[in-house]
Amino acid sequence: MNSNPFTKNLQNVTDPSDWEPTKLPNLKELDSLQRCYICKEFLKAPVITSCNHTFCSHCIREYLIVNSHCPLCKAEQFESNLKRVILLEEIVLCFSKFRPILLELLKKEESNEAYDKNRSPFSEIPSKDEDSRKRSSPDQEVIEISSDESNSLELSEASNDVPKKKIKAEINSNSRNAIPTRNEMVECPICAEVMSADLLQTQHIDYCLSGKSQPSSSRSAGNSSSRYQSMKRRQPNKTNNGISSFFKPADNKPIMAGAGKLDLSKTDNQNFYFDEVSKHHHNDIKKLPKLDFSSLTTPKLKEKLSHLKLPVQGTRIQLELRYNQYYILFNSNLDSNHPLSEKVLKQKLNQWELSHSAFTNQGSTSTLFNNGSPAVKSITDKNFSVKEWLDANRNEYKSLVKAARASIKKASTKNVTSSISIDTEAINTHSVGGQHLNERSEYRSEANLIEPIDDGASEEIQQNEISNLNFKKDIANSPLFVKDTLNESHS
């Protein structure tokens, strides 16, 4: 036996593809249209957005905590624009109640048709051995018939001209006309006589209560129903439920397993929508407001939770998560036609906390539904807190600054030793001499004689030395300087 809880839960998962093996596979389209785009389940407390798309109230509110657009069309959405769809919720509830019955009926009819096609034409005529087995079976119900019918049966069996199939059909039709079906027969609560419900309610009950004799018409009807007594004798005794027992059959077995679990008398979706209009709105209960956690101190947040009779222990992130989740549960519950009590909502909140990593693992920094956390907010948000961001990433910034300073020092030492040197081969191709070349060589020698910058020197001294070297290097590499030098040497 598999004890995996996920396997057990999968057995209760419904999907539009369940209709494919039935006689009406196109019903999967109706099934899928009644499901939420986010959770893929049947719509619960459906709400419609300003862009005319419908989702579960819980799903879309949870989605809009982090996002600000419609999941389908990406149009901008606000939680305040969500509207209830009362009729759609009742339609979905009604369909989900009858869904298992429809599936079973369609599959059952399909299997019966396949069975009828595979049956041979001679399978309807039972053999003598089968007849004897059926007669000797203890579960087989025996129906006694009148002497006239038995004589006609013997005569028909004596003659071989009439086939058995025809005889069987005649007997079945006669017995059906003579004896009402079991569902049509009821028992008188006074004299315990079995008869039809119409006869009991119109004539028999009055005579039975007054103690008078039954009229001839009712007697004849009662005599025809007395043939049902043999069936009753072979059935187990049942307790008499009183006068209300004749409003329903004594033995009312469900047609299918799914129908036995469903009380069809409680499918009052139509009554709720048309008659119980006062239950459509919950004006006396206000929805919870959305909090701006960046402007709330921890004591203030705990005060808000305490006012809602919610736990106040935990870290700051846990407190924010707790409020957000209860905010979603509470407001989506008000969108339902059949809201739950606050006690049930708090039980759901407790179950959510037990399954959430931010509450089960200490020190976890999960940011699910945490719109107050800087990790969730965008840097372009008007409520973005720079101080919180700096505090959360202070250590990372320090390491980046340290690495940047080290790379600057390495780059400065390389520039002093290598990038200041000038390619002398290009200048020597020209017959350059004289005083300007000596001055140029002095600039180069002065640049090469400068010692590397000490690591312990201050940044101001380093910047001054580097700027002086760059200035001299620019003069030495200046094309005007080289041009003047060449002109003077040629002259």
Swiss-Prot record:
Subcellular location: Nucleus
Catalytic activity: S-ubiquitinyl-[E2 ubiquitin-conjugating enzyme]-L-cysteine + [acceptor protein]-L-lysine = [E2 ubiquitin-conjugating enzyme]-L-cysteine + N(6)-ubiquitinyl-[acceptor protein]-L-lysine
Zinc finger (UBZ4-type): 185-213
GO biological process terms, semicolon-separated: postreplication repair; protein monoubiquitination
Record pathway: Protein modification; protein ubiquitination
Low complexity: compositionally biased ranges: 143-161, 213-229
Binding residues for Zn(2+): 188, 191, 204, 208
EC number: 2.3.2.27
Main location: nucleus
Enzyme class per UniProt: transferase
Alphabetized SMART domains for the sequence: RING, SAP, ZnF_Rad18
Similarity comment: family membership: Belongs to the RAD18 family.
Protein role: E3 RING-finger protein, member of the UBC2/RAD6 epistasis group. Associates to the E2 ubiquitin conjugating enzyme UBC2/RAD6 to form the UBC2-RAD18 ubiquitin ligase complex involved in postreplicative repair (PRR) of damaged DNA.
Name this protein carries in UniProt: Postreplication repair E3 ubiquitin-protein ligase RAD18
